[in-house]
């Protein structure tokens, strides 16, 4: 041990302590030193190197572990909540028949939007596929078919389907070789009414289908029926328009089937292929047909109707129709002429036009021109005769006479003033009927305007310079309920017109026209004779007072019937007393005369 071993002399730049080396000792010396070390007390310099305290504090390690376990548990519970979703196949394990009650498939669980990056457990759970194993449930065998009917197997297979309508459409196309939607147009509302219905019936018994052939005859004018078991196809043309609800209820009561076994839509009545389907199908010996073909099938399959449809639209024929039927408004012309499409080829051609609105405006404008020219050519006698000849029904002229006497008027005086009023004599062409409210002034005058087709003007429109324009198209006119402001306007601006002179009348969208005022009746609550501020109107207007309240019976019906028929009887009875000319002097001698013609048709040819 005393041998001098170790490094040699120190190198340059090294200190002398680096040359110190540990001295080796024997094993006995090492054991003695270890025993001596353990025998020393704990207060030695190396006592802090070993912590042998049994009650050492845990610190935050246990709390941290609890938090980590709690978070992990919450994450797993949340994951299970998202993943847990009972599939319809799992429910079917309880009962195989529950499969027929499924209306819609179950929804899969939603994927998590945010996935935390952890030690790998969460990621491994998310990798599990959302998969539910389908269990095969043996379906019950279809029951045997009833005598003359359809077995329960068809009904159960239909109920087991999730989309019954799609299955019916598929079976319809398989049986008849054509899509149901190609034959029909869709009605979204069950309340919409239609006369023609295409009905597809599924699963009805044969004896009930045969019985329906007779039962439907009392409801339909045409029946088309073909059966490919278990489907049956009907085309029913009912006598009156029916809604889908009514038709379905009728079939349910006849065929004893469920509502889901019926497809009901109206046919495409403007499609030539669809019309040919029904027309050619009726020739099939397996098809039952009752009644005559509906009009929409005939018009698209018969040769004469096809040639009639090729006729071009003639505006003059439309104008002639409107003139003959006294249609002046555009809405009335369009609506009533469209209703003639089933019987009039020109109306059918009108509906095929893309410029129907333009034709209606042109027709209304031309009819107004013709009517205005016809009215201006007539005398007052011819006009009164023209108006009352178009009033249907009988009336009592005594009702008008009794009402005038009830108001305290001398009928002879009224008749004389009314005669000069109709003749439109200067300063005698205006009558005033005044009195308290509810005495029948407006009722009396309005009934006269309606019978003679007069025009009514209102002072409420006096702010417009065109408020007197209706006087240009009238043989007789009425100004109802004239107030003091209205009398001031008449006294200031209309005295020249009441004199019977020619005045200039402003016309909208046209140049002012030169004309004379027609006979004018005015109703008011003010008497001009009692008003000294209008002295210039006293000689131009003759007054009649209605002082008594208009009478009604216990049922609130007027005691005096002032109707069109009453005025027609009044003019016929007092024609001569009113100074109206004899119609024989004006050409009304009873001979057949040619009516006004505004079309190029032949006089004695077909209309």
UniProtKB/Swiss-Prot annotation:
One of its GO terms (biological process) is DNA replication. The keyword DNA-binding applies. Its EC number is 5.6.2.4. ATP binds at residues 435-442. It is found in: Host nucleus. Residues 583-607 are annotated as: Disordered. It holds the Pfam family PPV_E1_DBD. It is an enzyme of class 5 (isomerase). Residues 409-559 form the SF3 helicase domain. Can form hexamers. Interacts with E2 protein; this interaction increases E1 DNA binding specificity. Interacts with host DNA polymerase subunit POLA2. Interacts with host single stranded DNA-binding protein RPA1. Interacts with host TOP1; this interaction stimulates the enzymatic activity of TOP1. This is Replication protein E1. The lineage of its organism: Viruses, Monodnaviria, Shotokuvirae, Cossaviricota, Papovaviricetes.
């Amino acid at each position: 041990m005393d041998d001098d071993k170790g490094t040699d002399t120190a190198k340059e730049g090294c200190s002398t302590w680096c040359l110190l080396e540990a001295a080796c000792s024997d094993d006995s010396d090492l054991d003695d030193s270890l025993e001596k070390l353990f025998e020393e007390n704990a207060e030695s310099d190396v006592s802090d190197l070993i912590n042998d305290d049994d009650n050492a504090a845990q610190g935050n390690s246990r709390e941290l572990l609890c938090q980590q376990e709690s978070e992990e548990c919450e994450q797993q519970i949340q994951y299970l909540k998202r993943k847990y979703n009972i599939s319809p196949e799992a429910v079917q394990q309880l009962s195989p028949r529950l499969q027929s009650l499924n209306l819609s498939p179950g929804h899969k669980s939603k994927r998590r939007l945010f996935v935390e990056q952890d030690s790998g457990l969460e990621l491994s759970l998310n990798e599990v596929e959302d998969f539910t194993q389908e269990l095969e449930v043996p379906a019950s065998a279809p029951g045997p078919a009833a005598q003359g009917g359809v077995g329960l197997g068809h009904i159960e297979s239909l109920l087991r389907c999730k989309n019954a309508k799609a299955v019916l459409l598929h079976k319809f196309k398989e049986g008849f070789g054509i899509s149901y939607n190609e034959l029909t147009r869709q009605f979204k509302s069950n309340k919409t009414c239609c006369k023609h219905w295409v009905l597809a019936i599924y699963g009805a018994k044969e004896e009930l289908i045969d019985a329906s052939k007779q039962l439907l005859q009392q409801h339909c004018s045409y029946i088309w029926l073909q059966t490919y078991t278990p489907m049956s196809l009907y085309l029913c043309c009912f006598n009156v328009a029916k809604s889908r609800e009514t038709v379905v209820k009728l079939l349910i009561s006849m065929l004893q089937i469920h509502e889901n076994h019926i497809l009901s839509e109206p046919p495409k009545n403007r499609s030539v292929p669809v019309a040919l389907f029904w027309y050619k199908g009726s020739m099939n010996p397996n098809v039952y047909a009752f009644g005559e073909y509906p009009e929409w099938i005939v018009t698209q399959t018969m040769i004469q109707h096809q040639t009639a449809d090729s006729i071009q639209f003639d505006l003059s024929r439309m104008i002639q129709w409107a003139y003959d039927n006294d249609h002046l408004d555009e809405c009335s012309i369009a609506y009533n002429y469209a209703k003639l499409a089933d019987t009039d080829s020109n109306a059918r051609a009108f509906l095929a036009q893309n410029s129907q609105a333009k034709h209606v405006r042109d027709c209304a404008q031309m009819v107004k021109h013709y009517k205005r020219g016809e009215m201006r050519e007539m005398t007052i006698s011819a006009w009164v005769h023209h108006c009352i000849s178009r009033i249907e029904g009988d009336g009592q002229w005594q009702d008008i006479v009794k009402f005038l006497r009830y108001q305290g008027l001398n009928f002879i005086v009224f008749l004389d003033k009314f005669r000069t009023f109709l003749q439109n004599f200067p300063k005698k062409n205006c009558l005033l009927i005044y009195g308290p409210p509810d005495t029948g002034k407006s009722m009396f005058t309005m009934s006269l305007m309606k019978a003679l087709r007069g025009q009514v003007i209102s002072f409420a429109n006096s702010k417009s310079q065109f408020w007197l324009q209706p006087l240009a198209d009238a043989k007789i006119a009425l100004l109802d309920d004239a107030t003091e402001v209205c009398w001031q306007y008449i006294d200031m601006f209309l005295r020249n017109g009441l004199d019977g002179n020619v005045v200039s009348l402003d016309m909208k969208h046209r140049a002012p026209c030169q004309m004379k005022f027609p006979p004018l009746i005015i109703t008011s609550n003010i008497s001009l004779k009692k008003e000294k501020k209008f002295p210039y109107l006293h000689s131009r207007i003759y007054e009649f007072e209605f002082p008594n309240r208009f009478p009604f019976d216990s049922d609130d019906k007027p005691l005096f019937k002032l109707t069109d028929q009453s005025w027609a009887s009044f003019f016929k009875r007092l024609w001569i007393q009113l100074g109206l000319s004899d119609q024989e002097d004006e050409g009304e001698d009873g001979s057949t005369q040619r009516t006004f013609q505004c079309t190029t048709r032949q006089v004695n040819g077909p209309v």
